[in-house]
Amino acid sequence: GSTPCGESCVWIPCISGIVGCSCSNKVCYMD
């Protein structure tokens, strides 16, 4: 994924994961 979801995932998972975002390099990205 290359589109940032405006969310970090250093301490907690991506809340935006419900819309398809995933953690990459401590930042949530949409595939």
From Swiss-Prot:
Q: Is Amino-acid biosynthesis a UniProt keyword of this protein?
A: no
Q: Which UniProt keywords apply?
A: Disulfide bond, Knottin, Plant defense
Which GO BP terms, alphabetically?
A: cytolysis in another organism; defense response
Q: What does the PTM comment state?
A: This is a cyclic peptide.
Taxonomically, which superkingdom?
A: Eukaryota
Q: List the disulfide bonds.
A: 5-21, 9-23, 14-28
Q: Provide the tissue specificity.
A: Detected in seeds (at protein level).
Q: Which InterPro entries match?
A: Cyclotide, Cyclotide_bracelet_CS, Cyclotide_sf
Give the family, as the similarity comment puts it: Belongs to the cyclotide family. Bracelet subfamily.
* Function according to Swiss-Prot or TrEMBL: Probably participates in a plant defense mechanism.
Protein name, please?
Cyclotide hyen-I
